[in-house]
């Protein structure tokens, strides 16, 4: 698996495996990465996060290995603590993930991703389309659509501006 991931990376594509199916997309462009950086810079603890002990530890673009074997690489993963893994895919389930839509990969980010993440136990899934300014916020109990800029309160006690 690691060899396949390395070869994909060298070829200039990001490889993910969801439910046994390989999904790929081109490496992100400047606009995409600027949005990721802007969102990450806004992530803060709320009072709930303080009382719950959530550190709002956020990491961009790392592999997450889910219990059923899928391998995803969210644009931003938010955890309540620093994951243990440093040199391999992280196995701790993120509290929240944020995806920034890449042109041509809207279906992957807006339709496949949210359903998958929620099934795996991620509590908040936020998807931002920088071309339309759509902000999709999905939870087990509901889905909302908003227009950027918007402040999102996450269940874990973190907040971000998308």
Labelled PLM ranges:
Residues 1-162:
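Gly/Pro/Ser/Thr-rich low-complexity, intrinsically disordered segments predominantly at protein N-termini
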